[in-house]
């Protein structure tokens, strides 16, 4: 598919708050105890926040390793997964008798220090770095979430993904008395609902059995790590939308959203956790149980943009996939030029592949400020546009007087490409040929990526393909524009099309979407507001916002 025509800010360091749960008398500054009936939530008072970090999707990590510094291992694992979530970070550890949870808004390096990590002793830990898919960016919504099961027992949980039946699960929690009617809830995420239902089910059985009963009723994309005082659990939804891998340490086991998270702690890759599989790891080893039949639909955008290039997905190198996409893009959308440059970092491998295939020289035409986060995940449009200028700067001596092929990973809103084309022209480029290493993004994602409403997607302006391409080209100001085909992108992944989700490109969603449920980021906030007005959760269906509606349905 090719058209040719003639012409982050560092968050302030918050005062850290430790929640020690599982032993009476160990809770700090309890200010409310209002939300979950027999499973009380203890909220530590939060300092004032002024948070504007960039966003990505979440990363989860877990380790079971007696005799190891599990909190530090988890810290390093989260460091490797920082690109997946930059709003908040947290770690939970357990030593066989209690669970300790520490979390705050900010990057992993902002939330944790040596003193904090040294105080978190145990043999099992989970960690989470957050990008919000459901619920606002608040301290309460940081993870891991914690719920009491019984006196001296509890469960901590971290979640990567996004559920599509949150309203249904919240109604079930409400019917069980797990959601307060009028008192503001300390957390408003689908992850919090899962934690509440899991703890509620474990009150009358084991945590493992409660999970096996709950998970088949959960719909959407989810990779979970959760734990009690002794055991680490990890599971993946039946479609395997998001990645999750198992690794081996000399004295234990590790799970991580990406294999790069295993590498950083010296764990050897064992295998991917299968779709529909629950793992339990304790002193008896690793137990595997199927809670649903697998129907693999891995997110193809993980290959294009989300995952680290040094990770592998379903046995395929992410870096290798991106280079191959670039080669195919060169064959599908050739153009005469003097130099190929990539938009760092995720556009660089595809640019290398394009240069290799086309025979046109590759050069570094853009410098990236490593301390500014990704742009399509910034919390507001104004900051997105500012962030592009902050993060990229052209090397004028490299590009002046040249015809450039500029390779980027994707076009969502078009802000990056529009600002980039303007900068490169000002720096002296005589022609700008933009090539995109993914097809046009035309549909929102309901499974955990920050794609906006259809009206905000630049490729969704018109239905006709050629008119759309011309509209996007004009919108970003390029001389020519070319996208790789859907077929070419899938072929580069070396995965069968039947095992991938590419709904953001073709609108075919593998996981059934509820016809009436509000799928927006603030679905739980809306439900609580309805309850405050006297409307019951069972009345919510009549008050839902339709799937193609207004700004309340921010597509996540």
Curated annotation (Swiss-Prot):
Listed pathway(s): Purine metabolism; IMP biosynthesis via de novo pathway; N(1)-(5-phospho-D-ribosyl)glycinamide from 5-phospho-alpha-D-ribose 1-diphosphate: step 1/2
Class of the enzyme per the UniProt entry, highest EC level: transferase
Cofactor stoichiometry and binding remark: Binds 1 Mg(2+) ion per subunit. Binds 1 [4Fe-4S] cluster per subunit.
GO molecular function, one term: amidophosphoribosyltransferase activity
Active site: residue positions: 58
Essential cofactor(s): Mg(2+); [4Fe-4S] cluster
Taxonomy, superkingdom: Bacteria
Similarity-based family: In the C-terminal section; belongs to the purine/pyrimidine phosphoribosyltransferase family.
Identification of the protein by name: Amidophosphoribosyltransferase
Organism of provenance: Mycobacterium leprae (strain TN)
Lineage: Bacteria, Bacillati, Actinomycetota, Actinomycetes, Mycobacteriales
